[in-house]
A protein has these predicted regions:
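Domain-scale detector for complete catalytic domains at protein termini or as standalone homologs
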Residues: 26, 30-34, 124-127, 131, ...
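Short, contiguous alpha-helical
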Residues: 1-13, 47-106, 139-197
C-alpha cells in the first residue's frame, strides 16, 4: 500500500468512534497482512540473503518485523489483563523463548539486538517466526472478546506523529495495532516487494 494512502486511512480510522474504529482496523489488518504474508512465503533463502535498503539482509528485515510483532503479542496479553501502559511502550518486558527478560535503551538498540540474533538463524526459522507472529497477532486483534474496543480504549493516551506533520491522538492500545500495520504495509514494503517504487 502506498504510504500516503495508508496514513490517510489511519487518520480517518482514528477519528471514528471506538466500535467503528475497531471494525475498520480489522478490515485494514486483513488488507495489509495478506500481501505481507504472501511476500514472506514467496521469499527464498537466496532472496533473504540480499541486502536491503538499510544494509540488513532481507531475512533480518523480516525477522525484525516478526520480533516487533512478537513483542506486540506480549503487549496485547498485558492489555487483555488490564494493563494501561504495556511494557513495550518503554521498550521493556521483551521475553525471549528461554524466559530471559530484556530491556532496551532505544528502538535502535532493539533492532540491533534482533539483527545480530537473526544473522545466525536460517531463513526457514525466520520465515516460520514471521508467519506465526503475523497470524497470531491478526487473530488476537480480530477477536472481539479478547481485544475489545473497551480494552483498547482503557489504555493510556498516546500521540503518534505521522509523516507530513500529521498526527493522531489515540490510546496506546490502538497505537500498537496501527503501528503493526504500518510496519507490514509501509515501512519495509519496498524492500519486500509489496509496493512498486
Amino acid at each position: 500500500m502506498k504510504a500516503e494512502i495508508f496514513y490517510h486511512k489511519i487518520v480517518a480510522i482514528a477519528a471514528q468512534p471506538p466500535a467503528e474504529r475497531r471494525n475498520s482496523l480489522v478490515g485494514l489488518h486483513t488488507e495489509v497482512v495478506t500481501p505481507y504474508l504472501n511476500a514472506v512465503r514467496a521469499m527464498t533463502a537466496q532472496d533473504a540473503g540480499r541486502v536491503s535498503s538499510d544494509n540488513r539482509t532481507l531475512g533480518q528485515v523480516v525477522g525484525h518485523i516478526a520480533e516487533w510483532e512478537r513483542f506486540s503479542i506480549l503487549a496485547v496479553g498485558e492489555i487483555i489483563t488490564g494493563v494501561r501502559w504495556p511494557q513495550i511502550m518503554n521498550l521493556s518486558g521483551y521475553v525471549e523463548p528461554d524466559g530471559q527478560v530484556c530491556e532496551f535503551s532505544s528502538i535502535d538498540a532493539f533492532n540491533d539486538y534482533q539483527a545480530s540474533k537473526h544473522a545466525a538463524w536460517s531463513w526457514e526459522q525466520i520465515q516460520n517466526l514471521a508467519i506465526q507472529t503475523a497470524a497470531i497477532l491478526q487473530i488476537l486483534f480480530a477477536h472481539p472478546s479478547l481485544v475489545s474496543w473497551e480494552r483498547l480504549e482503557q489504555t493510556k493516551a498516546y500521540r503518534w506523529q505521522l509523516p507530513n506533520e500529521m498526527s493522531v491522538m489515540v490510546s496506546c492500545g490502538w497505537y500498537l495495532w496501527m503501528v503493526t500495520l504500518e510496519h507490514e504495509a509501509v515501512e519495509h514494503a519496498l524492500d519486500l516487494g509489496i509496493v512498486e517504487p
